[in-house]
């Protein structure tokens, strides 16, 4: 038995750039150039965002203190390596 067509239209999923016939959501990035006749893309460098770092000595500091020691993550392994039971135990601990 086939599902009703109403059920297909009633799904409530977030709209992505891949969904919707003849609907373009986009990613708010803007157009950085134009397509050429032969399928290429011509970049207009005046529209490209550039970030200029400070020149010379800069006294900007990182957000994390330099006194913090870097730690490497360790994961417990079960009898079968990192299986679903290990992840389940990690989530509920």
From Swiss-Prot:
GO terms for molecular function: structural constituent of ribosome. GO terms for biological process: mitochondrial translation; translation. Residues 1-13 form a transit peptide. One of its GO terms (cellular component) is mitochondrial large ribosomal subunit. This is Large ribosomal subunit protein mL41. Component of the mitochondrial large ribosomal subunit (mt-LSU). Mature yeast 74S mitochondrial ribosomes consist of a small (37S) and a large (54S) subunit. The 37S small subunit contains a 15S ribosomal RNA (15S mt-rRNA) and at least 32 different proteins. The 54S large subunit contains a 21S rRNA (21S mt-rRNA) and at least 45 different proteins. PANTHER family: LARGE RIBOSOMAL SUBUNIT PROTEIN ML41 (PTHR21338:SF0), MITOCHONDRIAL RIBOSOMAL PROTEIN L41 (PTHR21338). Its main location: mitochondrion. Component of the mitochondrial ribosome (mitoribosome), a dedicated translation machinery responsible for the synthesis of mitochondrial genome-encoded proteins, including at least some of the essential transmembrane subunits of the mitochondrial respiratory chain. The mitoribosomes are attached to the mitochondrial inner membrane and translation products are cotranslationally integrated into the membrane. It is found in: Mitochondrion. The gene is mrpl27. Belongs to the mitochondrion-specific ribosomal protein mL41 family. InterPro entries: Ribosomal_mL41. Keywords: Mitochondrion, Ribonucleoprotein, Ribosomal protein, Transit peptide. The keyword GTP-binding does not apply.
């Amino acid at each position: 038995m086939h599902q009703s067509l109403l059920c297909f239209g009633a799904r409530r999923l977030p709209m992505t750039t891949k969904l919707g016939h003849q609907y373009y959501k986009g990613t708010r990035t803007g157009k950085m150039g134009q397509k050429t006749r032969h399928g290429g893309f011509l970049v207009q460098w005046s529209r490209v965002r550039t970030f200029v770092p400070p020149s010379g000595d800069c006294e900007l500091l990182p957000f994390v203190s330099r006194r913090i020691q870097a730690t490497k993550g360790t994961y417990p392994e079960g009898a079968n390596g990192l299986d679903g039971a290990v992840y389940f135990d990690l989530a509920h601990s």
